[in-house]
Design a protein with these regions (language model features):
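Conserved nucleotide-sugar donor-binding catalytic segment
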Residues: 128-216, 223-224, 228-231
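Conserved donor NDP-sugar-binding/catalytic core segment of glycosyltransferases
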Residues: 76, 80-118
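Catalytic binding pocket for nucleotide-activated donors in carbohydrate/polymer assembly enzymes
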Residues: 659, 753-758, 787-859
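Short, acidic, metal-binding catalytic loop of nucleotide-sugar glycosyltransferases
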Residues: 3-7, 26-38
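Short aromatic/hydrophobic "clamp" motif used to bind/position activated sugar donors
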Residues: 68
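Conserved catalytic-core segment of nucleotide-activated headgroup transferases in glycan assembly
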Residues: 231, 525-537, 669-753, 827, ...
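Active-site and donor-binding regions of nucleotide-sugar-utilizing enzymes
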Residues: 354-355, 386-397, 504-506, 513-673
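A nucleotide-sugar donor-handling region in carbohydrate enzymes
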Residues: 493-503, 610-611, 617, 623-718, ...
């Protein structure tokens, strides 16, 4: 790329390539078409984070325009963008020195975050913002921004700050020049991920983005501002909350990148405590109402606890016309904003059974929560069901979870269910919310309802109203719901209208059919649900059974060849089967997303499905997995296990299965297909790592996207080195073994990243790959924490574990302890593993007696009758629990 320079140019654009030649060529071509007043300066930043700052400083010296801007490969720049920006600058600024001009900016990749970064949504007119008066609108990164060139040269980037060099430069400039021109009438599309884009931003995997960033960037900036101005300007305080939020969100719950070990997490917490001490309570609680700084109330409370280094701090109730919660002299939260989350509602034996939760913002010693049926009070029974939010793998806060049973009166015309909070002698109503697929109701449509037994229920302001069900009243509410959908401009709601209409047209036919819906991964079959489906399909019981698959996957054609007819995903028939199913049998959690329903979409049909979820497991439930396998994750009614250690683990209160008779010791369906057909093959099959895979960006029912950051992970480096190790390959050749490296389904999109050789097969576990065949034909398995180890141990074949020192682990031991229960030796380096594998191959790959005894102790069964045991229990459950109430749906 050559440098383009125009005499008398108005804007110098520093172009940073993305590395994607097609994107770079497209963006660069667009820049050259912007007009003669544009000078384009190509920049070569290198791969190191500090290289971008150095390249920026070098390029800035070449800038000949009055303004300088930054563009990146893949950016979408409107035609005439810079010319139009210059016109608006001339019109708005006049003679005022406004050094920074910012358009409305959109991130071009799909993102879980839709909120613009420091842009006031309500501001739709071009304006000049004073940061002393408005802390909501200003730039924290350069893409599409125009800077006064002379001003920019006074604030070069500090390359030693790496990821933070750009923010440091902008913040220092804005601290001295607090006017920002905001032009929301122009939109700039940027492709370079920012800190808040936790699915793409590369800095998340760099330890320097954490503790060194606070110590070298944030704290010096805060201390300097305090010294210069006597206080921290509010816009800088808001930036600090945004800065902290980015790092918390990037490492919350399953997003934990495992970059920091336990000691570093404590050190990071201490560093954040120092930074928060500079901030006011109002800024921490986001009282300025900056959208990008807004988090759940518990998050702001946690930051207050961190600031004060007091983890027992709770909000105190202040009693006025409404209940307020706060700390000290700062009001943080209003009762009017509090909601009681309905996580599951059911009707059993004449009672409404409600599982719910409320945010743990206050001490239960200070308030009383209860529910009323009309004016009769019922106390909540609090439990220990999983409700934690974790950051960096450490519990940060929870919700108060509860269960309550409310008898319904058969002779009452109307019964109102209302949650109430009592504090200081005053009583306040609390509104329900329905942020669960299984909450039966939602506030999406005014006339939405749930019909059950002889009753109909619907949301009514701050309460739920239950009335005796009459066919005409049900029809009235349904038709009014159709009217709401028909009047909507949303195409989604138009499709929902057709779906609901089709359901009611076909319901008389479907209600006569008992339906079981089976699925595994949708984009791949061959797991426990398929095995159970095959067995159940052969039984004569009057139940209609369907196995859900995507027609694009090879297993679709395989099952068709074998005489089965899978249910086509997203077909009209699939939609109707899902809404009318009696049971959904799943080997993977999150039933609604796997069937194409996001939380927003399921809100339109919550009152229709009434299926009972059956878990037949993808892996063994012996680790701490309450976040994914607690009872209310999928409203699981039956949970089939292969080991007493699973039952012991799942019986802990955090899973909330006690008292529901859901846990059954039967074996796992897919074990019925495990027959030894040893073909002298070494199978390497590790599980995935959260930090090595892209987060879900579409749905759990489709394969995850390629992760461009994968090759930077220790996971890739360790296994790429292992499969290309000369000693391992030489030993396999010597003793007549082949090697197969099977990628986990979530890692399979990265198959092309691995270096190949002639002797090791790299096999994505998608397409027509069969796990069962791999298990049958392999002589020995190398794994880490993967659930496939149990399939191999079930066959009493030898295993070796690689718990590598360099790969962060996300396994938390429950009732399976590797030091005393593992089915093979545990290695911590590649060299140690290869030494052991050479010995096993030399001796014929036989399972040692010690590990055989462990397998005998772990598994309750060793036969191939698992499907039969499970089917018998399911059939009894259908007859006893489902059939008696089917006619009430």
């Amino acid at each position: 790329m050559g440098k383009t320079q125009q005499s008398g140019c108005a804007v110098s654009v520093l172009f940073f390539p993305s590395g994607d030649e097609e994107q770079d060529r497209r963006t660069l071509g667009g820049l050259h078409r912007q007009g003669r007043e544009i000078q384009v300066i190509p920049v070569e930043p290198g791969e190191d984070p500090s290289g971008r700052a150095k390249a920026y400083n070098r390029a800035l010296k070449q800038a000949a325009g009055r303004f300088v801007s930054v563009a990146g490969g893949g950016d979408r720049i409107p035609s005439g963008y810079y010319r139009r920006m210059l016109k608006k600058i001339h019109k708005l600024a006049g003679s005022r020195p406004v050094p920074v001009w910012m358009p409305h900016r959109q991130f071009l990749s799909f993102s879980l975050l839709q909120t613009p970064i420091f842009e006031e949504k309500s501001c739709r007119r071009d304006t000049i913002v004073s940061l002393d008066l408005n802390c909501r609108t200003w730039p924290v990164f350069l893409s599409g921004v125009l800077l006064d060139t002379a001003t920019a040269r006074r604030y070069p980037m500090t390359s030693a700050l790496g990821w933070e060099a750009e923010k440091d430069m902008l913040l220092r400039l804005l601290l001295d020049n607090r006017l920002v021109g905001f032009v929301p009438t122009l939109t700039y599309g940027y492709a370079q991920p920012q800190d808040i884009h936790f699915d793409w931003f590369a800095g998340m995997f760099d330890p320097d983005w954490y503790i060194p960033s606070v110590r070298n960037f944030l704290l010096p900036l805060l201390k300097e501002s305090q010294s210069r101005f006597g206080e921290i300007p509010l816009f800088l305080q808001c930036f600090c909350i945004y800065y902290i939020r980015c790092r918390l969100e990037a490492n919350s719950n399953n997003r934990n990148k495992h970059v920091l070990d336990d000691g570093q997490v404590l050190a990071y917490r201490d560093a954040l405590h120092e930074a928060l001490a500079f901030l006011s309570d109002a800024a921490i609680l986001n009282l300025p109402d900056v959208a990008i700084c807004q988090s759940a109330p518990n998050v702001h409370q946690m930051l207050m606890q961190l600031k004060r280094n007091d983890w027992s701090m709770m909000y105190q109730p202040y009693l006025f016309k409404t209940l307020l919660l706060g700390t000290g002299e700062t009001v943080a939260y209003s009762k009017d904003s509090m909601r009681v989350r309905m996580e599951f509602i059911d009707y059993r034996d004449g009672k409404w059974e409600i599982d719910g939760s409320v945010p743990a913002l206050f001490s239960l010693d200070d308030v009383r929560l209860y529910v009323c049926r009309n004016d009769e009070e019922f106390d909540l029974t609090y439990n220990q069901r999983y409700s934690l939010t974790k950051y960096f793998g450490v519990s940060a806060f929870k919700r108060y979870t509860f269960h309550v049973s409310i008898p319904l009166l058969e002779d009452e015309v109307q019964q109102d269910i209302q949650f109430r909070l009592q504090a200081g002698g005053m009583t306040y109503p609390l509104s329900p919310e329905y942020s669960s697929h299984f909450s039966r109701l939602s506030g999406k449509l005014r006339f939405q309802y749930w019909r059950f037994g002889r009753f109909i229920a619907y949301h009514a302001g701050n309460r739920i109203t239950i009335r005796r069900s009459r066919w005409w009243y049900t029809a009235y509410r349904e038709i009014r719901s159709w009217g709401e959908l028909l009047c909507s401009r949303s195409m989604l709601e138009k499709r929902v209208l057709l779906l609901r209409m089709l359901y009611f047209i076909t319901r008389p036919w479907y209600r006569r059919r008992r339906i079981w819906l089976f699925y595994d991964k949708i984009y791949k079959g061959g797991d426990s649900s398929e095995y159970l489906f095959r067995y159940a399909k052969k039984q004569t019981d009057g139940i209609h059974k369907y196995y859900l698959l995507d027609p694009s996957c090879p297993d679709w054609k395989r099952m068709k060849r074998e005489g089965y007819h899978p249910l086509r995903r997203h077909s009209i028939r699939h939609r109707m089967i899902f809404l009318n199913a009696d049971m959904v049998i799943a080997s993977n959690s999150t039933v609604f997303p796997f069937n194409g329903y996001s939380m927003g979409l399921s809100a339109y049909i919550r009152g229709i499905p009434d299926f009972h979820v059956v878990c037949v497991q993808h892996g063994m439930s012996v680790q701490k997995i309450a976040v994914a396998q607690n009872r209310l994750r999928d409203n699981t009614r039956l949970y089939f296990c292969a080991s007493r250690y699973e039952i012991e683990n799942l019986s802990h209160p955090v899973y909330d299965y006690q008292g529901y008779d859901a846990l059954k010791l039967t074996g796992v369906p897919r074990y019925d297909g495990l027959v030894n057909e040893d073909k002298k093959q070494i199978l390497i099959s590790p599980t995935w790592r959260m930090q090595a895979a892209r987060l879900v960006t579409k749905s759990e029912s489709v394969q995850r996207d390629y992760n461009p950051l994968f090759k930077q992970t220790s996971y890739f480096k360790v296994y790429n080195s292992l499969i290309n190790d000369e000693r391992l390959i030489a030993a396999a050749k010597k003793y007549g073994y082949t090697i197969a490296y099977v990628l986990h389904p979530i890692i399979s999109p990265q198959a092309e990243d691995f270096d190949t050789n002639e002797y090791v097969r790299i096999i994505p576990s998608t397409g027509d790959m069969s796990y069962e065949q791999m298990f049958r034909e392999s002589s020995l398995m190398v794994t880490d924490f993967s659930g496939v180890q149990f399939d191999f141990a079930y066959m009493r074949k030898p295993l070796v574990y690689l718990h590598h020192h360099d790969i962060p682990q996300h396994y938390e031991e429950g009732t399976f302890h590797y030091d005393t229960m593992a089915f093979g030796e545990i290695c911590h380096t590649n060299d140690e593993l290869i030494d052991l594998l050479c010995g096993y191959m030399r001796d014929g790959c036989r399972m040692k007696e010690e590990y055989r005894r462990r397998a005998d102790d772990f598994f309750a069964f060793r036969d191939r009758n698992n499907c039969q045991r499970i089917y018998d229990i399911m059939l009894d459950y259908q007859k006893e629990k489902i059939d008696p109430v089917r006619h009430h749906r």
